[in-house]
C-alpha cells in the first residue's frame, strides 16, 4: 500500500478537497463567480430566483422559465399543520438555527426524498418553505400569533419580509433582500457546504445533507458573524466612540467579527455591493449613527491591521435598517445558501465517491493490554 501524502495546514487551509463547476472564490480579476457569472453583475441585474435556478439547474432561465419557477415556488410556501405544531413547541429563547435545523429535519420526515430523481423538487420545496419556517416560529414564540404562511409577494425576499412584518414591504427593501440572498447563495467549499458534500457522499437523502449543513453553519466561526458585528456596532454612539472602542478591542486582542477572510486576500467582492445598499438604507431612514459607526470601525481595522470587511460586516446594518431582528440574521443565510448546498449535493451525487480522508496519528505507540487487576 502506498504511503499516504500528509497535507499540512490548520483547518485544511489551501488544500484542494474536490472539484466543482459551481463557483470560483478569490481568483484574480473575478473575486466570486457563480457558474462563470461575476456575483457583482448578478447582484446588480438578476433576481435571486434567477440565481437559484442558475445554481440548481445549470443555466440562467429564460423569462418563461423564470415565470414558471416563480409560480412553482409560490405554490410550495405553506407549511404542513404537523410542522406548524412542532414549531409552536419550540421556545422563544431557542437558537433560531436550531429552529431551522429542526424544521428542515421534520419536513424530511413527512415529505421525504424517496429517490434522487426528486432532488430538484425537494430543494424547491425547502427554498419556498424556509422563510415560513423561520417566521412562523418567530411570530408565534415572540408575539403569540399564528401567521398565514402564504403571501402574494412574488419573490422569496419580499415573501420573507411580508411574513416577518405582516405588511407589504417597500420596493427598496425587496430589492435589498434580493441582493443579499444573491450574495450569500454560494461560496465553494466552505465548512457547511463541505459538510453537506460529505453527507451526500454517503448517498444520504437531501434533508440529511441540508440538516448537516445547517448544523455546521450554526457554529460561531462560520455563521453568526453578521449577528456578532451588529452587537458590536450597537455598543457605540458615535464614530469617535467606535474608533476608541475598536482600538481598545485590538489592544486586548478581542475577536472582531466581520473582518478578513480565509480565501480572499485583498477584498471581499460582496462587501462593496452590500455596503452601498446599507448606505442607501441609512439615507432612507435618516441614520446618523449606525452607518458612520460602521465606517469608523471599517477604517480603523484597515489602518491598524490591514483587515478588510467581509460580506457579513455591512450586512449587519443592512438587515437592521430593514427591521430584521438580529437573531434572524443567520437563518436568512440558510434561506440563501440552501441553493449552493443543494447544488453541491447534486454535483457530489453525479460523480460520487465516499469522502473518507486519513488522519496523521499523534498518539502513543502500540502497547500491551494490561488486565484491570494489574493497573
What residues fall within each predicted segment?
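Non-transmembrane, aqueous-exposed alpha-helical and coiled segments at domain scale
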Residues: 1-375
Amino acid at each position: 500500500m502506498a504511503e499516504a501524502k500528509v497535507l499540512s495546514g490548520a483547518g485544511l487551509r489551501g488544500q484542494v478537497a474536490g472539484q466543482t463547476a459551481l463557483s470560483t472564490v478569490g481568483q484574480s480579476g473575478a473575486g466570486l463567480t457563480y457558474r462563470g457569472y461575476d456575483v457583482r453583475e448578478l447582484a446588480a441585474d438578476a433576481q435571486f430566483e434567477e440565481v437559484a435556478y442558475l445554481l440548481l439547474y445549470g443555466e440562467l432561465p429564460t423569462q418563461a422559465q423564470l415565470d414558471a419557477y416563480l409560480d412553482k415556488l409560490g405554490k410550495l410556501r405553506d407549511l404542513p399543520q404537523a410542522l406548524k405544531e412542532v414549531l409552536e413547541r419550540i421556545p422563544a429563547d431557542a437558537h433560531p438555527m436550531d429552529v431551522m435545523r429542526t424544521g428542515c429535519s421534520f419536513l424530511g420526515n413527512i415529505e421525504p426524498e424517496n429517490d434522487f430523481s426528486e432532488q430538484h423538487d425537494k430543494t424547491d420545496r425547502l427554498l419556498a418553505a424556509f422563510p415560513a419556517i423561520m417566521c412562523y416560529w418567530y411570530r408565534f414564540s415572540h408575539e403569540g400569533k399564528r401567521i398565514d404562511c402564504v403571501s402574494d409577494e412574488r419573490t422569496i425576499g419580499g415573501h420573507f419580509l411580508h411574513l416577518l412584518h405582516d405588511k407589504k414591504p417597500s420596493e427598496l427593501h425587496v430589492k435589498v433582500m434580493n441582493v443579499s440572498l444573491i450574495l450569500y447563495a454560494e461560496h465553494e467549499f466552505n465548512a457547511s457546504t463541505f459538510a453537506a458534500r460529505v453527507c451526500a457522499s454517503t448517498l444520504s437523502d437531501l434533508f440529511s445533507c441540508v440538516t448537516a449543513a445547517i448544523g455546521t453553519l450554526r457554529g460561531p466561526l462560520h455563521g453568526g458573524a453578521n449577528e456578532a458585528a451588529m452587537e458590536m456596532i450597537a455598543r457605540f454612539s458615535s464614530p469617535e466612540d467606535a474608533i476608541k472602542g475598536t482600538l481598545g478591542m485590538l489592544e486586548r486582542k478581542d475577536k472582531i467579527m466581520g473582518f478578513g477572510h480565509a480565501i480572499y486576500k485583498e477584498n471581499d467582492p460582496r462587501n462593496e455591493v452590500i455596503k452601498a445598499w446599507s448606505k442607501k438604507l441609512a439615507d432612507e431612514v435618516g441614520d446618523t449613527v449606525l452607518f458612520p459607526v460602521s465606517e469608523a470601525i471599517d477604517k480603523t481595522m484597515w489602518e491598524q491591521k490591514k483587515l478588510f470587511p467581509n460580506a457579513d460586516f455591512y450586512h449587519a446594518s443592512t438587515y437592521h435598517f430593514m427591521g430584521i431582528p438580529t437573531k434572524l440574521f443567520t437563518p436568512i443565510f440558510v434561506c440563501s445558501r440552501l441553493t449552493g448546498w443543494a447544488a453541491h449535493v447534486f454535483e457530489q451525487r453525479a460523480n460520487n465517491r465516499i469522502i473518507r480522508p486519513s488522519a496523521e496519528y499523534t498518539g502513543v505507540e502500540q502497547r500491551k493490554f494490561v488486565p484491570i487487576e494489574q493497573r
